[in-house]
Amino acid sequence: MANTSSAKKATRKIARRTAVNKSRRTQMRGSVRTVEEAIASGDRDAAVKALANAEPALMRAAQRNIVHKNAASRKVSRLASRIAQLGK
């Protein structure tokens, strides 16, 4: 249990940030999921549109330290390469 007033405030701040970050992480995962579902269904046009929405979501999450920037870039790259495979 926090003893000092500053520690209590820090605890409140952490709780608020955690809630915000959870929301952002969920939103990011949802956008990635739509891309993966489109890829799984074999619909290239839908996958391209979904990736156009997912890429900014991933990069925003990376800017806000929800995921590492390299992890976000890697995810975008792998999704894009999977979409490229659909065209062949």
UniProtKB/Swiss-Prot annotation:
UniProt-listed InterPro entries: Ribosomal_bS20 (IPR002583), Ribosomal_bS20_sf (IPR036510)
Region feature Disordered, mapped onto this chain: 1-33
Cellular component, GO, one term: cytosol
GO molecular function, one term: structural constituent of ribosome
Alphabetical UniProt keywords: Ribonucleoprotein, Ribosomal protein, RNA-binding, rRNA-binding
GO biological process, one term: translation
General function of this protein: Binds directly to 16S ribosomal RNA.
Family: Belongs to the bacterial ribosomal protein bS20 family.
Listed name of the protein: Small ribosomal subunit protein bS20
Native species: Rhodopseudomonas palustris (strain BisB5)
